[in-house]
């Protein structure tokens, strides 16, 4: 007997949930939202979930609130590029489609290499979390294992095969991370700040992602409005929509302006930061470039190219941060966004607390493309 080939669908979306961590309850809550969101949608929503204390599964969420276990796996490391690559390939084989989307769901820390995180505790507790803070996300964590951005880029298609890549994870709207991932998808939806563990409202956004022409701006608006209109203690969110085929031009414009500027003389304390770390790692990209001097025409060209790259952004007045540095707002756990362009950047500087990050940053494709060497 020969099985017939799978029937090609209009769109297949894979949600890859690396939930072998403290976000497992939020993962299942999001799956419940997906069941609601797919109530009357004709398309393939495939969920790989590796839950803490459970068995990794490949699920199909269908209209009518139906959830089917397609495959189960032995215990495995979902924060492994080999597992991620296998799941992507398996999903495309089982559910071929005219177009594909990918949601990466877990913890996240932008471009910062996983190996730096534990070591940085010896450097002024750079990554120390506030013990009273609610959960936020990264990408990706399975127990003590993580995926570096360079490895993630290698595990994803290099021909923008995905129509979109959505990060339901903290800090992934970093220009360094997204530049390295620019060939994975046509559009990337990501937040340059922290995302609360409740994440995106999948019941609301799935109809937009499965539309004949996906409505990415509406997905972003719905995400921020979900928190903006929330009555919870933490009604905060930010997001950017990035057109990836503009990122090379952004790097070129950044290089031209950066060469004319004096970044070492910038007063970093005056640059919009996006978290409450003891020493800030994520700053607003445009605000930083506005404070390093340089040729006015080249700056205008950079700012114009940035508007072509970040085609939509939205944010609440404040954003939440789980870190333990000074803050404002409820319980002093927030950061006020006086300016926001939709992308973050690392600001290179000679500080002992940043030594390991500084060394790693010089090796990022963004730093090399822009000519950031110090």
Go through the PLM ranges and name each one.
Residues 6, 118, 125-374:
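Terminal, contiguous helix-loop blocks that mediate binding/assembly
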Residues 48-72, 99, 103-143:
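Surface-exposed loop and adjacent secondary-structure segments within mature catalytic domains
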Residues 1-98:
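N-terminal extension/subdomain marker
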Residues 26-27, 57-58, 112-117, 177-178, ...:
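Short, solvent-exposed loop/turn and secondary-structure capping segments
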Residues 12-17, 44-49, 100-104, 163-167, ...:
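Structural recognition of the beta-strand scaffold that forms the well-ordered cores
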Residues 20-23, 106-112, 170-174:
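Gly/Ser/Thr-rich loops at beta-strand to alpha-helix junctions
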